[in-house]
A protein has these predicted regions:
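TPR/TPR-like (Sel1-like) alpha-helical repeat modules
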Residues: 216-220, 320-327, 337-354, 425, ...
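Conserved structural position within tetratricopeptide repeats
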Residues: 102-106, 139-146, 182-183, 213-217, ...
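Residue-level recognition of tetratricopeptide repeat
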Residues: 119, 123-126, 163, 197, ...
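Generic helix N-cap/helix-start motif at coil->alpha-helix transitions
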Residues: 152-158, 184-192, 219-227, 254-262, ...
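N-terminal leader/linker segments that initiate helical-solenoid repeat arrays
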Residues: 2-156, 462, 469-470, 474-521
Length: 521
C-alpha cells in the first residue's frame, strides 16, 4: 500500500467490504447513570428519545443496505462516529481510512465509501489539528460527488464538504452547501450540526438557534444536545448550556464523545471564572479520553488560574506538542510573556506564524487568531487590514471584538469602540470583550462606562488572561472610586424572576434548557 503522502493516487482504479448496517449510535433507553434531576432538555427532546427507539446511521454511509455489518472494532466505531458527525478516536479514524482506501481502490464507483473516506480524513485532521488532511478529504468527497452528484441523492458527500468548509473557517460556503441539502431533504438530521456551526461562524445566532430547534425536532441524543449546548453558550445562556452539555455527556455512547462534552463543560466553567470546576471537568475528560488534547489545554488554563504555574506550563507545552492549534500557541506564548520569559514567548509566536502559514496552504483561514496576535504583539495596522477583510466574510462577535481592539491599538479608538459594542450585542458575556471595551472607554474619557466594563471583566472571569487580567485591575485602580452624590438606584426596581422559570443555576437541567427553547429567537 502506498504511503499517506502518496494519497490520493494519480490513477483511479479504485471499494473493502463495505459495512452494511452500522451499529446504533444512541441507547434504547436512558443511560444507567441518569438521575431524576437530569430530565431531558424539554418535552420536545424527551419525546425524541422514547424507550425502544434506536437511532442508526444513514444507510448509505454503511456502503449499501445489502453489505454485511462490520466486525466490532475500530472501523465500526469510527464509521458510526463519522456518519453521525461525532468525534472519534484517532486510532479508529486511521483504521477506517485504511479500510476505505483499500475498498475504493477496487470499487471506484462506490460513492458512499468515497464520502466515508473524505469525512474520515476530515475527522483525522480535526483530531490532530493537522490541516494537511483537508486536501485529501476534499479530494475524496469531490470524487464521491463525481460518481453520484448531490442532486441525485449524494447528500452525505455534500454535507462532508460543508463540514470541511467549516473546518477551514469558510462559513459562507458551508452554509450554502448545507442549505442546499436541507432544501432537498429537510428531514436529514445530519445536516443541522453543520448548519449550526456555519451560522455561528457567520455571527447569525438566530439562524444557529433555528437550526438547533430543527435538529431537536428530528433527533435526540448526545450529538443534538451538545450542538444545542454550544449555541446556548454563544448566546450567553450559561445555565441552559450546562444543562444541555450535562445531558449530552450522560447520553454519550463512546469515551471520545463523552470526553468532548466534559471538555465543553470545562470551557463553560472557565467562562464563568470557576477554575476549580474547569479543572475538574477537564481532568475528567482526560481520564475518559487520554487522547483529548484540547482538554489538556483547558486543564493548563485552569491550573494557571489556581496558581499551579509549573503544572500549567507542563500541560500547555504537552498540549501544543500534540495539538498545535494557533490559539493554543498564542496562549502559551502569552503565558511565557507574563512570566518574563521573552525568548520562550517569541518561540511560540514563531510557531504560531508557521502553523498559520501551513494552514493557509491547505485552505484554512486563520485570520482571526493572526489578527489578535498582531494587534497585541507589534503589528496593529496589519491586524486591522486582516480583520477588516475577515469582518466582511464572517461578521461574528469574536471578529468584531478583535477588529475593535486592533483599531484601538492602531490609534483609532472611536471606530474601535463601535466594533466592540457590536461584539457585545452579537455575543454573550465575555471577560475579554468587557476588558477591551473598558480600556477604550477609559482612553476616550468615559470613566463611568470604563469602570463598569473593567469591573464586569473581572467579575465574569478574574483569570481571563495572564497578561490582561492584571492590567484590568491596574486600570480600575487608576480610575479610582466613582464620584459621590450620584444616583443610588441606577437600574431601578427589577422584579424577581417567576418561580420555575428555569433560569437559576441550581434548577433542573431539563427545565433550564426548556426555558431557553421557548425564548424568542
Amino acid at each position: 500500500m502506498e504511503s499517506e503522502d502518496e494519497w490520493p493516487p494519480h490513477r483511479q482504479t479504485l471499494t473493502l467490504p463495505p459495512p452494511a448496517r452500522p451499529t446504533p449510535l444512541e441507547p434504547a433507553g436512558p443511560p444507567p447513570a441518569r438521575t431524576a434531576r437530569r430530565t431531558m432538555i424539554g418535552a420536545a427532546v424527551a419525546a425524541l428519545l422514547t424507550a425502544g427507539v434506536l437511532v442508526v446511521l444513514p444507510t448509505r454511509f454503511g456502503g449499501g443496505q445489502d453489505a454485511p455489518p462490520p466486525a466490532p472494532g475500530p472501523v465500526a466505531r469510527a464509521l458510526t462516529a463519522v456518519g453521525a458527525g461525532a468525534p472519534a478516536a484517532a486510532a479508529d479514524l486511521t483504521a477506517l481510512i485504511a479500510d476505505r482506501r483499500a475498498w475504493v481502490r477496487t470499487h471506484p464507483s462506490d460513492d458512499a465509501s468515497w464520502a466515508v473516506l473524505g469525512s474520515a480524513y476530515l475527522g483525522r485532521g480535526l483530531r490532530a489539528a493537522d490541516s494537511s488532511y483537508y486536501p485529501r478529504a476534499e479530494w475524496a468527497l469531490r470524487r464521491s460527488l463525481a460518481v453520484r452528484p448531490a442532486a441525485r441523492g449524494n447528500a452525505d458527500a455534500q454535507i462532508g464538504l460543508a463540514a470541511l468548509a467549516n473546518a477551514r473557517h469558510d462559513y459562507g460556503t458551508a452554509r450554502t452547501l448545507a442549505e442546499e441539502v436541507r432544501r432537498r431533504d429537510p428531514k436529514r438530521w445530519t445536516v443541522y450540526p453543520v448548519l449550526i456551526d456555519a451560522y455561528g461562524g457567520l455571527g447569525d445566532l438566530k439562524g444557529a438557534s433555528r437550526s438547533v430547534e430543527q435538529l431537536l425536532d428530528l433527533r435526540g441524543g448526545s450529538v443534538a444536545l451538545a450542538a444545542s449546548g454550544a449555541v446556548y453558550r454563544e448566546r450567553g445562556w450559561r445555565e441552559d448550556a450546562a444543562a444541555a452539555l450535562t445531558e449530552a455527556a450522560a447520553y454519550a455512547t463512546t469515551p471520545v464523545q463523552k470526553a468532548d462534552c466534559l471538555r465543553q463543560l470545562g470551557d463553560l466553567a472557565w467562562d464563568r471564572g470557576e477554575p476549580a470546576e474547569a479543572l475538574a471537568q477537564h481532568s475528567a475528560a482526560l481520564r475518559t479520553d487520554p487522547g483529548g488534547h484540547a482538554a489538556l489545554a483547558g486543564k493548563a488554563r485552569a491550573e494557571l488560574a489556581l496558581g499551579r504555574t509549573a503544572a500549567a506550563r507542563h500541560d500547555y507545552a504537552a498540549a501544543v506538542a500534540r495539538l498545535p492549534r494557533p490559539e493554543y500557541l498564542l496562549e502559551l506564548g502569552e503565558l511565557y510573556e507574563s512570566l518574563g520569559l521573552g525568548a520562550d514567548a517569541r518561540a511560540q509566536y514563531a510557531r504560531l506564524r508557521a502553523r498559520a502559514a501551513s494552514d493557509d496552504g491547505h485552505g484554512v483561514n486563520d485570520a482571526l487568531v493572526l489578527g489578535r496576535f498582531e494587534a497585541d504583539h507589534g503589528a496593529p495596522e496589519s491586524a486591522v487590514e486582516r480583520l477588516r477583510a475577515q469582518w466582511r466574510r464572517t461578521p461574528n462577535a469574536a471578529v468584531a471584538d478583535a477588529l475593535g481592539w486592533a483599531l484601538y491599538r492602531a490609534g483609532e479608538p472611536e471606530e474601535g469602540l463601535v466594533f466592540l459594542k457590536q461584539a457585545a450585542e452579537k455575543g454573550g458575556r465575555s471577560a475579554l470583550f468587557s476588558y477591551h471595551r473598558g480600556v477604550l472607554e477609559r482612553e476616550l474619557g468615559q470613566s463611568g462606562p470604563a469602570r463598569r466594563d473593567l469591573e464586569e471583566a473581572l467579575r465574569t472571569n478574574p483569570y481571563f488572561s495572564p497578561l490582561l487580567a492584571p492590567k484590568a485591575r491596574e486600570g480600575l485602580e487608576g480610575l479610582g472610586e466613582p464620584a459621590e452624590g450620584g444616583p443610588k438606584d441606577v437600574y431601578g426596581y427589577v422584579p424577581d424572576p417567576p418561580t420555575g422559570s428555569g433560569s437559576s443555576g441550581s434548577g433542573s437541567s431539563g427545565s433550564a434548557a426548556a426555558a431557553a427553547r421557548k425564548r424568542k429567537q
